[in-house]
Amino acid sequence: MKQYDYLIVGAGLYGAVFAHEAKKVGKKCLVIDKRSHIAGNIYTEPVEGINVHRYGAHIFHTNNKTVWQYVNQFAEFNRYTNSPVANYHGEIYNLPFNMNTFNKMWGVVTPAEAKARIEQQKAEAGITDPQNLEEQAISLVGTDIYEKLIKGYTGKQWGRPCTELPAFIIKRLPVRFTYDNNYFNALYQGIPNGGYTAMVENMLEGTEVRLNVDYLADREALNALADKVVYTGPVDAYFGYRLGALQYRSVRFETEVLDTDNYQGNAVVNYTDAETPYTRIIEHKHFEFGTQPKTVISREYSAEWNKGDEPYYPVNDAKNGALYAEYKQLADAEPGVIFGGRLGEYKYYDMDKVIEAALDVVQKELA
C-alpha cells in the first residue's frame, strides 16, 4: 500500500482546493511545489506591512454563490472593487470604457451623444470585414478609443503591432453607456483580508506540503509515494515537449518600495501609450485600503516567453489550440493522473473558474 492517496503537484488554487476536499473525506494527500512558497501565482507577501501580489494583480470576482461561500470559509473578503484607470500621455481615463471615459474624451454628456460619436467613427472607418485586431477594434469602438486606449497597450501586451494580431483576439469590447467604473460586473468581488497566501494556507491546513520539489526531475520516486497524481504544471512539460512547446506570454515585474504614502491614488493604472515600456503600475496598498507610511509599486512589463521563463498567459491562437488538443489526448490517456488548472489545461482561468473546475473534478473523483 502506498503512503498517500494523492500526490498533488502544485500548491496553487487548484491543488489546494483538491487537497482540502480530499482531506475532508479522509484521503491522505502530499502537496509538492517547485517554488519556495505555496499559492502559485496568487501568492502575496508582506512588504512594509503591505500584502504585495508578487505575480501581478489578482482581484477575486464571481457570480457563483457557491464559489463565493466556499472561499469565505478560508478568508474574510474586503469590499475592494476593481476600477482601473488608463494613463495616455498624462491624460487619465476611466476603465472599462464608460460614460466617464467618453465625457473625458469628447465632452459628451448623454449616452445618446456617446453612441452617436462612436457610430460616426465606425462609419467613417468603413470596415466591414476586419482582417486584423486594429480593424476589429475600430469596427467595434471607433478610432479615438482605439488610438488612445487600445493600440499601444495591446501592442505591448502581445509584443507586436495590432495590425499583425488576429482579429479574433478581441471578440467584443465592453462599452458601457452608464457612469459606472466597476470593471467586473460580478455579484461578489473583493480581496481576502491579509492576502491570498493566508487563504491558501487555510485550505492546506493539516495537509503535508513540501516546497522546492521539482516533480519532473524526480517523477518516478514521487509517483511511487501515491496511488494517484493531480498534476497542475505545464501539460507539455509533463510529456517532455514531445509534440512541441505550447506558447505563452510572460510578464516581468519591477517592484520597489517608495517613501511616500500614496504614489498614484489607485491600485491599477494602465499605461496605454506605446512609448511607456511597461503596461501598468500596481500600487498594492490600495487593494486593502492601506494607510501605511510607505508604499510598494510594481511596474509590469509584458515579455516573450522562452522555455524556463514563468508562463503567464496561454497564446490562444489556432496553432496552439490544435497542439493543446493533441496534448489533451495524451493527458486523457495517462493512467492515474488528473490534469488541472491554468497550466495543466492550457487556458486562461479566472480564480473562481479554477475553484469551480477543481470542485467539479474532486467531487467526481471522490464520489
Language-model regions: role of each:
Residues 310-367:
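C-terminal catalytic lobe of FAD-dependent flavoproteins
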Residues 4-31, 362, 366:
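N-terminal Rossmann-like FAD-binding beta1-loop-alpha1 element of flavoenzymes
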Residues 48-123:
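Dinucleotide-binding Rossmann-like beta1-alpha1 core, especially the glycine-rich loop
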Residues 215-330:
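Mid-domain catalytic core of redox enzymes
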Residues 20-48:
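Glycine-rich FAD pyrophosphate-binding loop
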Residues 4, 26, 207, 225-227, ...:
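Short, well-ordered alpha-helix to beta-strand connector turns
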